């Protein structure tokens, strides 16, 4: 056939090729152990001998000297590219049961559809971590990938190989030709606080919870960073397999253990639903005896042939279900009720409680929303209170334990003045429940919160500019004059201005100084200089990142200005319609209101913001510093908008896009992104844990795209995307 490529004859003997492959594999393995794991198993001399043998072989047979040969690579240059890879067998989600009725209904469906009474349930703890898929071929780990959208994940093989529990080679008997091993990578609870303390000390943002810590650690571009994190894994399933057959999942777990894989210690085979209930109840009471966070209990049909008989829906197996525990509640002492000041001046009461462990993390503070909520809950300072926390949700005070009062409790009185700047508090308008500090410009608390928000990922995305840096720049102990009186001078910061700054190390939740655990004294730090007075690396990086932020798109600039009611979605709508900060300023309130995605509340807030002279001064200073204040394309010269007229809903967690990034990609191509599914919806894009929007789309037969289909929509348009949409259930 024309254009067909024919294999070229080769003069390299087969035994030379085999020897070359063996040497290359050995050298790569030893390099990985030396540069990434920092745990070499051969001496430098032995390694050099291997490398010289490979070089000699390539000298004799030049055809073997390919670009990917170890002789052609720079040692130590390991970096994960996170390329997309296809799972051989799809990684499904799980349906959930939140109460005994839901669990019993699932068990009843299993009993009805399985066609026999001879079956068992396998119960195991649901690890709250990052799902991964390991591929072993002839016993050797050839690939590790994240779950992604279930069909396509990211290749994280070098990073996973740094986890000591995951074997590079399987050991023992009955090793299959191919097997996919599914599991969860997690961050141990006891190490989580240590990591966050180090991150804060370095000026980086701490992780919200151990699951995020596991995901962030595993997705480092440099595997050497991953190697420093105490990651662990629990294996909980099998995907595609060749040369491997087994009758029961519990037996498979035993075999996986023999192969050297880390299976769960918290699993039990039971005969019936009562056994399932006993397992759930036991770990409901003993969940904190487990070294990792748990997200519930997974109940599976143990017999693998019967699993195949029940099959799966388009998103979850019918033979398994996840039991979700109710949010955990504990009693603790309400030490005080303080007030915090937010970036828009809103003054919010919050509870300071005796430290207590709940839902896997230690809690010292909880939200109380406003003074009316404090009254409605009936809590007094000194009360024993009931506190609830679920996952990474903000802890909440439910109410007092009235029977434990001893008469020393006292009522909370909302302060009349701002606790940070002393300005009298007042409602923003008549009838408002919330009180606000009207001193927006010079209140250090408001500026601190605005700067922290401005540096966040949804705004200017300035890495190394964390809460400690924002506090130090707005209310230092030294010098007396804060380096930043408002946002206007942000882009004029220099290392010389940063070095002398001393400040309290503030807690992000409370805004209070942290205390040394040994001495009890409030922590003070020279934030940007080391003990020798030289710049810290994070200070230099912060200034570099501030400079890079000058080139952010207009929508992110608008978000960073903290205009009330203007979040990322409204900012994108304004930027898309007006293309420059000046045109937004010059637009009438009517023009703003009529803009798609804006409306009267946002329009009024924008006009009110630009009416302040000091806000205009920020814009002037940023322009002078070179901050980009308009998008490059004009409305007349706008590029093609292939998704014009489409309405798209995005739900669940995407692997290759943040939620905001997905919206930006759709909106820049002309699509309208909404938050609810209807018959008018063109496509629903689903990631991990999509929830009810996915179900609604299936019910209405709206085309549903996984992340691979989403890529087709962006790159090839709606017609091509429709062809790869997920099948709707009949």
UniProtKB/Swiss-Prot annotation:
Choose any GO biological process term that the UniProt entry carries and state it. DNA repair
The region called Disordered is annotated at 1-23
EC main class here is ligase
Catalytic machinery residues: 126 (n6-amp-lysine intermediate)
Residues engaged in binding NAD(+): 44-48, 93-94, 124, 147, 184, 300, 324
Q: Name one GO cellular component term.
A: cytosol
**UniProt keyword Coiled coil, yes or no:** no
Q: Which residues form the BRCT domain?
A: 638-727
GO MF term (any one): metal ion binding
**UniProt entry tagged with the keyword Nucleus:** no
Q: Its biological function?
A: DNA ligase that catalyzes the formation of phosphodiester linkages between 5'-phosphoryl and 3'-hydroxyl groups in double-stranded DNA using NAD as a coenzyme and as the energy source for the reaction. It is essential for DNA replication and repair of damaged DNA.
Q: Which family does it belong to?
A: Belongs to the NAD-dependent DNA ligase family. LigA subfamily.
**What is the official name of this protein in its record?**
DNA ligase
What is the originating organism of this protein? Streptomyces avermitilis (strain ATCC 31267 / DSM 46492 / JCM 5070 / NBRC 14893 / NCIMB 12804 / NRRL 8165 / MA-4680)
């Amino acid at each position: 056939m024309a254009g067909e490529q024919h294999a070229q004859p080769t003069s390299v003997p087969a035994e030379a090729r085999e020897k070359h492959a063996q040497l290359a594999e050995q050298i790569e393995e030893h390099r990985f152990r030396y540069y990434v794991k920092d745990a070499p198993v051969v001496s430098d001399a032995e390694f050099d001998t291997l490398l010289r043998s490979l070089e000699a072989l390539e000298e004799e047979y030049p055809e073997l000297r390919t670009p990917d040969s170890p002789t052609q690579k720079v040692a130590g240059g390991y970096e994960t590219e996170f390329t997309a890879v296809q799972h051989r067998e799809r990684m499904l989600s799980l349906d959930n049961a939140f109460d005994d009725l839901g669990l019993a209904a699932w068990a009843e469906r299993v009993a009805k559809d399985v066609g026999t009474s001879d079956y068992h349930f396998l119960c195991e703890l649901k690890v709250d971590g990052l799902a991964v898929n390991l591929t072993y071929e002839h016993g050797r780990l050839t690939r590790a990938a994240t779950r992604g959208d279930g069909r396509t994940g990211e290749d994280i093989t070098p990073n996973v190989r740094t986890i000591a529990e995951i074997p590079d080679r399987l050991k023992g008997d009955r090793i299959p030709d191919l097997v996919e091993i599914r599991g969860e990578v997690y961050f141990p609870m006891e190490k989580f606080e240590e990591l966050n303390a180090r991150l804060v000390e370095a000026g980086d943002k701490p992780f919200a919870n151990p699951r995020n810590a596991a995901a962030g650690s595993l997705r480092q571009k440099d595997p050497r960073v991953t190697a420093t994190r105490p990651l662990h894994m629990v294996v909980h399933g099998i995907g595609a397999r060749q040369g491997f057959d087994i009758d029961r999942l519990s037996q498979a777990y035993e075999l996986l253990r023999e192969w050297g894989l880390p299976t769960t210690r918290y699993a039990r085979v039971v005969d019936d639903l009562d056994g399932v209930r006993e397992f759930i109840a036991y770990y409901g009471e003993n969940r904190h005896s487990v070294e990792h966070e748990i997200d519930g209990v997974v109940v599976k049909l143990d017999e693998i042939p019967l699993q195949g008989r029940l099959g799966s829906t388009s998103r979850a197996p019918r033979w398994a279900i996840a039991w979700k525990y109710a949010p955990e509640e504990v009693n603790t002492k309400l030490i005080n009720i303080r007030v915090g000041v937010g970036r828009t001046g809103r003054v919010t009461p919050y509870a300071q409680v005796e430290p207590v462990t709940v839902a896997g993390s230690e809690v010292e503070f909880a939200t109380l929303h406003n003074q009316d909520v404090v009254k409605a809950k009936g809590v007094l300072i000194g009360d024993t209170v009931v506190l609830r926390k679920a996952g990474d949700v903000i802890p909440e005070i439910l109410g007092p334990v009235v029977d434990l009062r001893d008469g020393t409790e006292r009522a909370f009185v909302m302060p009349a003045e701002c606790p940070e700047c002393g300005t009298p508090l007042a409602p923003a308008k008549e009838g408002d429940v919330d009180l606000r500090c009207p001193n927006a410009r010079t209140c250090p608390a408001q500026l601190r919160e605005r700067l922290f928000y401005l540096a966040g990922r949804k705004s200017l995305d300035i890495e190394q500019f964390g809460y400690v840096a924002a506090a130090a720049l707005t209310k230092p102990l030294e010098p007396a004059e804060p380096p930043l009186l408002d946002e206007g001078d942000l882009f004029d910061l220099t290392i010389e201005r940063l070095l002398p700054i001393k400040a309290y190390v503030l807690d992000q939740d409370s805004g209070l100084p942290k205390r040394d655990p040994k001495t009890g004294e409030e922590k003070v730090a020279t934030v940007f200089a080391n003990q020798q007075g030289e710049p810290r690396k994070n200070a230099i990086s912060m200034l570099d990142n501030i400079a890079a932020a000058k080139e952010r798109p207009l929508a992110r600039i608008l978000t960073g200005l903290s205009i009330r009611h203007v979040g990322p979605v409204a900012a994108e709508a304004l930027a898309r319609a007006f293309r420059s900060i000046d045109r937004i300023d010059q637009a009438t309130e009517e023009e703003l209101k009529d803009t798609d995605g804006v409306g009267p509340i946002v329009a009024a807030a924008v006009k009110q913001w630009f009416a302040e002279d000091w806000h205009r001064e920020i814009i002037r200073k940023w322009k002078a510093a070179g901050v980009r204040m308009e998008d490059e394309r004009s409305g007349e010269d706008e590029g093609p908008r292939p998704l014009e007229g489409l309405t798209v809903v995005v739900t669940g967690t995407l692997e290759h896009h943040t939620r905001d990034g997905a919206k930006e990609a759709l909106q820049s191509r002309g699509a309208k992104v909404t938050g609810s599914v209807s018959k008018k919806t063109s496509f629903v894009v689903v990631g991990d844990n999509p929830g009810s929007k996915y179900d609604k789309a299936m019910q209405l037969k709206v085309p549903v795209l996984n992340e691979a289909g989403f890529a087709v929509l962006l790159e090839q348009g709606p017609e091509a995307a429709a062809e790869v949409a997920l099948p709707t259930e009949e």
